[in-house]
Structure formats: structure tokens, C-alpha cells
Regions:
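Structural signal for interior beta-strand "rungs" in well-ordered beta-sheet cores
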Residues: 41, 102-194, 202-330
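Terminal amphipathic alpha-helical/low-complexity segments used for targeting or macromolecular assembly
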Residues: 1-106, 167, 172, 178-179, ...
Length: 362
């Protein structure tokens, strides 16, 4: 990347800078790896302690750190270090949305599509009939926009992203490689009542249903996605059966997540890696689902709910709950159960001892 001075970087971060503000910075590193010309990111005490192992002249520090005692020539101070990383990494990212506006000659673009100014469209991409693509779009290679889809301004669609027909996406959308939006939902039915339906209704009894083939229920709905949404690599969002699947504004979805048909997700939710949300479930606003959380179908998860990793949600969750475990329960309850389970071997031994003593007395 082109170099940036300490003064310029501090201004970009709305941060305070001290020392030699004319030092040039070409990148960032952890303190022990930082060489001259790199900014040492030392925003917590363990990292500050390792500054002496590297050769950094400039460091990003939390407010209040004595920078002069660290043999630095300059420092940038921030109130909330992790938040500062968002601005810092954006400023120093050499690969983000690089390249001038152009359309690669191998791209296939339907003449009825509307592509606004500033678009960069990579090799072997396909834009279907009636597509509307907003300003300053950045498309990698092998990106597909299905017929009738709409994508707002400033989208970033990395290599291999597939957007199905009639999908509607808001402003500043980011899709990491391999994202698929608008594939058919997982929806099948048998002619007669199947064993799995009996099990679902009775919680265990298969009944006398005979094996039989399954028939596809086609997905006639689409997908709607709000503004400032990001989807991680190889995540999938299925189209609705009749109505649309909906993801609210500000949601961030990690890699390898599955969002089923008819799901509704509110605003500003965090969906971590390997989460699965089954069909027709609804999430409120500001929900956080830890990695490998599973949400069963046709459930409601209220606003501000947080689930720990690998939680399995099998029933509705009221707003504001913090959940953990399989099945999901209040985190403090689950932790109490876990602690008591660890005590079981000792309790069994104690019970056996007491039983033996009583038998001897008899």
C-alpha cells in the first residue's frame, strides 16, 4: 500500500497522536513482529509487554499508556481499541475493493439489465435479465445475479457469489466468496403421513407409517436483505416457499451459516459460523447466535437474545434471555447443571460408601 503518516492515520481514526507525526506507516503488525515502518497494534497489556521484542517506532495504544517508557518515537491513542481496529484495518487493507471501474470482456450481461456508474465486474460473471445494480458495485469473478434481482449502491460481491432471481438487497452489501442467496428451500412432502411427522407430533412414536418417496415443494418466494448486511463465505440463504425470506439491516453472518426458507431476521443480528436456522423461524433485533447454534423450525427468538456456542434452540425464547446448552436453557441454569454433573462421580462414590456402611450395620 502507499504509505500514510502518523498524523494522517490519527486523523482518519479521530484519535490523538503524539511524538514524531511525520513517520510513514505502510502496514500493521503485532508488537513482536513489527518492523520499522509498521504500526504495532498494542491495545492491551499483554501486547504492550511484547513491544520490546519487535522494532516498531509507532504503536496504537489504549489511552493512558506511558508511550515514552516503551522506546517509541510516536503513538496513536484510542478510547476503544477494538472499535479503532475497524477504521485501522479498512485504511490499511490493500485488497479491499481494489481496481478501477471496468467490465471484463468475458462477463455476460443481459441488455435489459441496468448497471449504474462505477461498476467493476470481474471475469466470467453473469448478470441476468432485468437486473438492477447500484452505483460503485464491485463484483469479483464468477459472480451471478439472477433475473430480476436488485442490488443497491456500493455492494461488494466476491468471487463465486450467486444471487437468485428476484432477490432484493439494500445498500453497502458484502458477500464473501461462495455465498448463495435465493436457492430453493429444503421443503419436501410425502403423499401420506410419514414416520417423521408422527415422531414430530408424538415426540418419539413412529406409528405405522410405511416408507414412501418425497416430493419437492417448490419455492415461489424470494429473499429480501436490508442495508449494511454482510454474509460470510459459503453461507446460504434460501428463498421463501410463498412469502420472502427476510434479513434485516445491519446483520452480520459468519461463514458456513444456513438460513432456511421463510426465516425472518430482525436488524443488527450477529449469526456466527455454522449456525443453522430452520425454516419459518423468526429472530428479533440484536440477536447473537454463537457458533454452531441450531434453531429449530417455526420458532420465535426474541430481541436481544444471546446464545452460547453449540446451543440448540428447541422452543421459543423470550426477549433478553442468555441461553446455552442442548436443549437451550438459561445460561446460569445450564452452568449449574454442568457443575453438578461434574460432582456426580464423587456423589456416586459417597452414596456407595454410605450404602455399604448401612448394610454392615444391618
Amino acid at each position: 500500500m502507499d504509505s500514510i503518516t502518523v498524523k494522517e492515520l490519527a486523523h482518519a481514526l479521530s484519535a490523538e497522536a503524539v511524538g514524531n507525526l511525520d513517520i510513514s506507516i505502510t502496514g500493521a503488525a503485532e508488537p513482536q513482529d513489527a518492523q520499522a515502518g509498521l504500526l504495532a497494534v498494542a491495545t492491551s497489556e499483554p501486547f504492550v509487554a511484547r513491544l520490546g521484542e519487535g522494532k516498531a517506532k509507532v504503536a496504537l495504544l489504549a489511552n493512558g499508556v506511558d508511550w515514552r517508557s516503551l522506546n517509541l518515537e510516536a503513538a496513536i491513542f484510542v478510547d476503544r481499541p477494538r472499535y479503532a481496529l475497524a477504521g485501522l484495518t479498512l485504511k490499511l487493507d490493500n485488497n479491499w475493493r481494489q481496481g478501477k471501474a471496468f467490465i471484463h470482456p468475458s462477463a455476460v450481461i443481459d441488455p435489459t439489465s441496468q448497471i449504474a456508474s462505477g461498476a467493476r465486474i470481474g471475469a466470467f460473471s453473469y448478470i441476468g435479465a432485468g437486473v438492477v445494480l447500484g452505483k460503485n458495485a464491485w463484483l469479483g469473478t464468477h459472480v451471478t445475479l439472477g433475473n430480476g434481482s436488485f442490488v443497491g449502491d456500493d455492494p461488494t460481491l466476491l468471487d463465486g457469489v450467486k444471487i437468485g432471481q428476484n432477490v432484493i438487497i439494500g445498500q453497502r452489501f458484502v458477500a464473501q466468496p461462495g455465498v448463495v442467496i435465493g436457492a430453493d428451500g429444503f421443503s419436501y412432502v410425502s403423499k401420506e403421513v410419514a414416520a417423521l411427522e408422527n415422531v414430530r407430533g408424538t415426540l418419539g412414536d413412529r406409528g405405522d407409517a410405511l416408507p414412501q418417496p418425497y416430493h419437492r415443494i417448490h419455492s415461489l418466494g424470494a429473499v429480501q436483505i436490508g442495508d449494511d448486511v454482510e454474509l460470510g463465505a459459503n453461507s446460504c440463504v434460501d428463498r421463501g416457499t410463498i412469502r420472502d425470506t427476510i434479513i434485516g439491516s445491519g446483520c452480520k453472518v459468519d461463514n458456513l451459516a444456513q438460513i432456511g426458507h421463510n426465516v425472518i431476521i430482525g436488524d443488527n443480528c450477529l449469526i456466527c459460523a455454522q449456525v443453522g436456522i430452520a425454516g419459518s423461524s423468526t429472530l428479533g433485533d440484536n440477536v447473537v447466535l454463537g457458533g454452531q447454534t441450531g434453531v429449530s423450525d417455526n420458532l420465535f427468538v426474541g430481541s436481544n437474545v444471546i446464545t452460547g456456542g453449540a446451543t440448540k434452540v428447541l422452543a421459543n425464547v423470550p426477549a433478553g434471555r442468555v441461553m446455552l446448552g442442548y436443549p437451550a436453557m438459561k445460561m446460569e441454569t445450564q452452568l449449574d447443571i454442568y457443575k453438578n454433573l461434574r460432582r456426580l462421580p464423587a456423589l456416586v462414590k459417597e452414596f456407595a460408601r454410605l450404602k455399604s456402611e448401612n448394610q454392615k450395620k444391618d
